[in-house]
Each structure stands twice: as C-alpha cells, then as structure tokens.
Amino acid sequence: MPTIQQLIRSERQTIQKTKSPALKSCPQRRGVCTRVYTTTPKKPNSALRKVARVRLTSGFEVTAYIPGIGHNIQEHSVVLLRGGRVKDLPGVRYHIIRGTLDAAGVKNRKQSRSKYGAKKPKE
C-alpha cells in the first residue's frame, strides 16, 4: 500500500485495455488458417462475409476477416494478420493482409490497390 504522499507524488497508472490482444503489441502477426467459412452480419445488414479461424504464432486462435472480392485462402494457408475489427461481425477483431504469404491479392482491382495487395495493371 502506498502512502498518501507517494500517491500525491505520482498517481496510479491506469490499465489500458488493447483492442487487439492477440497481436501482443506487434503491428502484424503470422498464423495458420484452421477453418475458412462464411458468416452472416448483425441485424440491419445481410451478406455472406468471408472469415477464417487462425492459429497465431503468439498462441492465440482468433477469427479474422478476409477482405476483397474472391480469395485463395484455405485450411493450412499461412497468412499475415493486422488489427481492425469488422463492425457488423461480432467477435471479428482482425483482418487478413492480402498480397502477403499465402493470401493472394485481389484480381482486377484498379482503385485502392495497396489495401488489397493488387499489382499496378499494365498499360
């Protein structure tokens, strides 16, 4: 127990909760897909969102969103994950990075190419 004088000198540190704990303070993490499937979003929206269950090198098993139209990710694919939730999918707090490791970039993508790992099209 600190004294009142110690608390005046330096206040207690607030515990900061991270939004992506599985990354363990790293910008990205590598992982292996254990299951690739589609799921439906929350109430006002309707779609089949592509997600994957990923076992990370940090030991966590998380659900990650596969962005873009079409993908080549299957079970045992090695993928790179970044933080970032999907608002209408509960429990999905990570995104798979397209165009790295086993995740190919989106085909025929002309705009926002860097977000989807697409190469510059030939003129």
UniProtKB/Swiss-Prot annotation:
Residues 103-123 are annotated as: Disordered. It is found in: Plastid, Chloroplast. InterPro entries: NA-bd_OB-fold, Ribosomal_uS12, Ribosomal_uS12_bac. Belongs to the universal ribosomal protein uS12 family. GO terms for molecular function: rRNA binding; structural constituent of ribosome. The lineage of its organism: Eukaryota, Cryptophyceae, Pyrenomonadales, Geminigeraceae, Guillardia. Its main location: plastid. Gene3D superfamilies: Nucleic acid-binding proteins. With S4 and S5 plays an important role in translational accuracy. Located at the interface of the 30S and 50S subunits. GO terms for cellular component: chloroplast; small ribosomal subunit. Keywords: Chloroplast, Plastid, Ribonucleoprotein, Ribosomal protein, RNA-binding, rRNA-binding. Residues 107-123 have a biased composition (Basic residues). It comes from Guillardia theta (Cryptophyte). This is Small ribosomal subunit protein uS12c.
